[in-house]
Amino acid sequence: MKNKKWMINLAISNLLLVFLGVGLVIPVLPPLKEQMHFSGTTMGMMISIFAIAQLIASPAAGYLSDKVGRKKLIALGMIIFSFSELLFGLAQVKAVFYISRALGGIAAALLMPSVTAYVADLTTLAERAKAMGKVSAAISGGFIIGPGVGGFIAKFGIRVPFYVAALLAFVGFILSMTVLKESEKTMDINPEATQSSFLDILKNPMFTSLFVVILISSFGLQAFESIYSIMATINFGFTMSEIALIITVSGILALFFQLFLFDWIVEKIGELHLIHLTFFASALFIAVIAFTGNRITVALSTFVIFLAFDLFRPAVTTYLSKHAGDQQGAINGLNSTFTSFGNILGPLAAGMMFDINHFFPYYISAIILFGTGILSMLMTRKRKQANF
């Protein structure tokens, strides 16, 4: 039992190291933009390239984790991420920055399904929610700790955080190769089964309906989240330090819930009801922000919205992992694909809506999330009828 917990924590720690590395570089992106004389379009391209690479690579990565093993994919993801951060730190031209971001997206595609599947392999259904809460907490923790540490490290040079991120990922690679043990449930699938495996998953209406919900909800979440800082500044006059405080408090709140309360909530109401609750809560409080002029109300509503977002993701992952059977990698790979697709479209749509009217992203996000909540409830009824 202790050995199993150690292996789970080691796998999850890789995600912590990666997202700590991602968080480290956040404070230095604005000065790097100025140093390299990059346009906003160039910086946006770097974000999009990462997401597109992750989108394209996720299905294959999920299948490969079932075929060749979680450990190999986790280790490969860590070394690719390490190289991508090192390359970004050394880059002097746009093309190299773009290549670095593409490699980072591929690394994320390799890591997310593999770590999630690894954790699912080593946990019982009763243990699953708590373990998936830890997976999400590792991501949240990296984003919370990273920017503060990155701001301090950047005093030694604005590219130093990239080198530190590369080093952290390399440490994770070494630990994965030398200490992490392969899970016993890894499948050995013949090549002919690859296509039929994905087709079987996508032909299953219960999985497909949930993937549609994931896609639509990711679009709505990112339409709000991606330009929150800009909207808060222009619409309500928040300073950057105030926005940073709101986001930090939101992250700490999410971390607490993911680590200590997520499994209790799932035990009480179940993953599907939690998913419904997060949709309706986020839609309601986004609408509150859209129609209030009170800054305190905006801040408190933001806490609820970001908490709902951070409970939705592990709830979906937990539910999928409980029904994935021997296709943990493939299912989680498709989950990452549909999430990435929504993450790409959401910010683009939000930016265009913001140019038309500064409050349009609020209205559209609230409508989409409320509609997705209704859709997910209807689909839940069908799942119950199908005993899924």
Model-predicted regions and their roles:
Residues 134-177:
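Helix-loop-helix hairpin linking two adjacent transmembrane segments in secondary transporters
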Residues 272-316:
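C-terminal transmembrane helical hairpin of 12-TM major facilitator-type secondary transporters
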Residues 100-141:
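Cytoplasmic helix-loop-helix junction between adjacent transmembrane helices
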